[in-house]
Amino acid sequence: MSWHCSSGAAERRAADAETRRLVAKFAPAQEQLVDATRRWLRKRLPTACEVVYEYRSWFVISYSASAQGYEGVLGIRGDGDGVKLYFQQGKGLPDPEKLLRGAAQARWIAVESASTLARPAVASLADEAIARSTVPFEATGRGAIVIRSKSAK
């Protein structure tokens, strides 16, 4: 079984529409911020798969070299309380400005506005996380959007 990300234009449009539906459902006040964060991540990882999960009260978009979300390097979590930028292997990242939150392997930054993403320290953390990825990303192409099954309600 191949876990490579690829999809046609129609599949991509349908998956993007489902992603937007989930964002509107779980983080309606944050739709523009989620869009800005997705664009910011897609600029850094144009060939990454956006692996989208729905949980009880939030959504997650993992940016992965494959259709396996657990291989994701960076991610977005959104809910009614806001948007977070996740660093899956954030524990070992150099963070001189102490931006990363959390105590486990994965760490996160609250994305309060698009200006958060414009901070050089945030860009540096993301770029370092990508550089440390153990799963290589495709050199060319465009990553697919992969919708994973809904969680049990």
Describe every region a protein language model picked out:
Residues M1-K153:
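Charge-dense, helix-prone N-terminal extensions
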